[in-house]
Amino acid sequence: MALQASSSPSMFRAIPTNTNASCRRKLQVRASAAAAAANGGGDGKVMMRKEAASGAWKIDYSGEKPATPLLDTVNYPVHMKNLSTPELEQLAAELRAEIVHTVSKTGGHLSSSLGVVELAVALHHVFDTPEDKIIWDVGHQAYPHKILTGRRSRMHTIRQTSGLAGFPKRDESAHDAFGAGHSSTSISAALGMAVARDLLGKKNHVISVIGDGAMTAGQAYEAMNNSGYLDSNMIVVLNDNKQVSLPTATLDGPATPVGALSKALTKLQSSTKLRRLREAAKTVTKQIGGQAHEVAAKVDEYARGMVSASGSTLFEELGLYYIGPVDGHSVDDLVAIFNKVKSMPAPGPVLVHIVTEKGKGYPPAEAAADRMHGVVKFDPTTGRQFKSKCSTLSYTQYFAEALIREAEADDKVVGIHAAMGGGTGLNYFHKRFPERCFDVGIAEQHAVTFAAGLAAEGLKPFCAIYSSFLQRGYDQVVHDVDLQRLPVRFAMDRAGLVGADGPTHCGAFDVAYMACLPNMVVMAPADEAELMHMVATAAAIDDRPSCFRFPRGNGIGAVLPPNHKGTPLEVGKGRVLVGGNRVALLGYGTMVQACMKAAEALKEHGIYVTVADARFCKPLDTGLIRELAAEHEVLVTVEEGSIGGFGSHVAHYLSLSGLLDGPLKLRSMFLPDRYIDHGAPVDQLEEAGLTPRHIAATVLSLLGRPLEALQLS
């Protein structure tokens, strides 16, 4: 006999140990719920109830930990297998309450996870991970998946130093079949896994979950085209929440969905004939059970023929069997469809089109203009976020201000972003110049060549893309822009370490991959004022491409140019900020500030160093570098970028010039040659060895003062 909590005065009652697993679970859940109600909520306030009229679960959010009696019994997907549909619906409600409660205390990606709660429950109920592979595209929506796969107890650490990653990560869990962070990769990965399965003689299922936004990228269509040709069994779940661009795309709320795909999906959603025929097929299936396959298939075939004038959907033209649209918040429908697809002997690639709502079930997210896509800590009762006050704006906002000033002075200035208006600051530009701002969807390759076409016709395009996302369009940067010397301006946001988003979003490589191009001008500002000047510099460069990088986070409080209108800098010229002797620190980008702080620390050791701001990696200020090398014993370059970046260019020049043949000691400080995990920015810089303390210790060591260096390090 086992003792379980009860609503009786003794609070315990016996459950026979020979009770079958399903009945035993129901008794445990009911007992836990009764106990929670009796003690005022136990660890959490009872905040969920099922409404009799609609059958829907009503969640009353508060700051208290929710009572989750059913979720408490689910540690891994195996614990969900015997749950009934009503229990799965209750599990989804508890999971939604758990996510809101957890993310309210940690921050993170909220609304995308709330939108796929029922999907995650249905997938893990029907399929058997980690044998079956579920690949979440991008990964913003993976929180319910993480909770259901053994990581609930660590969710309070998500996106924090040494905590859970904000995205699926293969070395975090066997249930994370493929790492994510960037968009539109899941179908390609799923197809590779499906083909590998077939070659190895395995029988597992492979499922890709991809949003309509990710479907705007060319890679998704390349993968679907190939999957239709290879005809391997796999399932693509298209999560259609009408979010082709992130909901922060404009200042007025969600952007109008971009491209023909969104129109096609809307037609599919609104097809009355299709919906009626789907319901007819479902009714036939329920009526004649196991013999329904042939009859239902005929009805389904007819339904698919109604979708377009040509008698098929785009997906079927690519070789995928299309099912949908399906209510993505109906556990019953999702489970039924997944079970049907799972039981089909050789379906080839199947696309299940589900319709969901971002932020579903949490009223503040449903009502918010940005759907609470990415949030800091917030009050779960109201949704009000606890944003820290800062006397300065973000670098992104300073960039936007400067670009607006350039556009006011020159009507040829235009802005391009890849579904990231809010992230890149071009939502501000769009508000001022809606006809000169272009959201091309999650399509960095297209964005770059589109900008090249604009430049070829005499416009002045600024292509604003995160440093890590520009990697996706690199061949276009080389072949379509740099080779032709077209004056496209690249504003590379989120350069360097990015904190909680981790290595998938870290902008470590842009200096290396841009400065190796023969025609590219490569800049990095030391502060927000310099950023404004570099925007003006890029606007003035009209005979070749240019780029400038800037970090996540806020400015340092530098004195801004009048009216926030920058002044073009002399291309390829740096500046000396502090004069000294023996030692020179040559900083690139925001590491100039770390060099200044290191110089202050070194004064306490009687060392007065020269601090210079390189400004340009290409072309280098060779005159400044030669002067620093000739007049100092030690030269240290400092950058927040990878090996092969600014320091490499300086070392290469000094080597070719013979300036390393003498007594000069040269050291380059840069990001370590490995990926740095997510965490607080201060922790990441510490791990990378790029704090002012590390710079000062390096100088002391080079000057033959190892004990003092050791005390600092």
Curated annotation (Swiss-Prot):
Principal location listed in the UniProt entry: plastid
Gene Ontology BP annotations: 1-deoxy-D-xylulose 5-phosphate biosynthetic process; glyceraldehyde-3-phosphate metabolic process; terpenoid biosynthetic process; thiamine biosynthetic process
Signal peptide: none
Keyword entries, A-Z: Chloroplast, Isoprene biosynthesis, Magnesium, Metal-binding, Plastid, Thiamine biosynthesis, Thiamine pyrophosphate, Transferase, Transit peptide
Cysteines engaged in disulfide bonds, as pairs: none
Catalytic activity from the UniProt record: D-glyceraldehyde 3-phosphate + pyruvate + H(+) = 1-deoxy-D-xylulose 5-phosphate + CO2
Any GO CC annotation of this UniProt entry: chloroplast
Annotated metabolic or biological route of this protein: Metabolic intermediate biosynthesis; 1-deoxy-D-xylulose 5-phosphate biosynthesis; 1-deoxy-D-xylulose 5-phosphate from D-glyceraldehyde 3-phosphate and pyruvate: step 1/1
Binding, Mg(2+): 212, 241
Subcellular locations according to the entry: Plastid, Chloroplast
Quaternary structure annotation from Swiss-Prot or TrEMBL: Homodimer.
Name listed for the protein in its UniProt record: Probable 1-deoxy-D-xylulose-5-phosphate synthase 2, chloroplastic
Organism: Oryza sativa subsp. japonica
Species classification: Eukaryota, Viridiplantae, Streptophyta, Embryophyta, Tracheophyta
